[in-house]
Regions:
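Glycine-rich phosphate-binding loop
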Residues: 2-40
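Glycine/small-residue-rich loop that forms an oxyanion/phosphate-binding "nest" at active or ligand-binding sites
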Residues: 31-56, 60
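Hydrophobic aliphatic residue packing
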Residues: 27-28, 36-41, 62-67, 105
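Short glycine/serine/threonine-rich phosphate/pyrophosphate-binding segments
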Residues: 18-27, 46-49, 72-76
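C-terminal binding/interaction regions
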Residues: 49-126
Length: 126
């Protein structure tokens, strides 16, 4: 019922996380016209590879955008980007978030270049 009524209830996208055979995202995608983002979850002997394959290989007409195993953060960012297509405020927040991530990488790189690998890792692991 959630997937069938999601659009009417104001959803813009659905995120579905599942491990193992990971049917959840496909079942949801078959019941809605909204974008569905699948998160394969690490589990079992295959450590989520089976869930990745199950999530990414949907039949024609049942698209599921798939992120990395345990990739919930990227799933949330992708959902925000989908929402941002029609919402300039959300789009700007995503741009600000990505700028901050890039700035953080630049700061870490500068620190790494100054300290060297061994000291950087020693300081990071304190």
């Amino acid at each position: 019922a959630l997937a069938k009524n999601a659009a009417a209830n104001g959803f813009a996208a659905i995120i579905a996380a599942a491990g193992g055979a990971a049917h959840l995202a496909g079942v949801i995608a078959a019941q809605t016209t909204l974008p569905v983002i699948g998160i394969p979850v690490k589990s079992g002997a295959m450590q989520g590879v089976d869930a990745l394959y199950a999530t990414v290989q949907m039949p024609p007409g049942i698209p599921v955008a798939t992120v990395a195993i345990d990739g919930a953060k990227n799933a949330a960012i992708l959902a925000a980007q989908i929402i941002g297509v029609a919402n300039p405020e959300v789009r700007q927040k995503i741009a600000d978030f990505k700028k901050k991530m890039a700035d953080d990488v630049e700061k870490k790189d500068a620190k790494l270049q100054t300290l060297g690998v061994a000291d950087y890792l020693a300081q990071k692991n304190k």
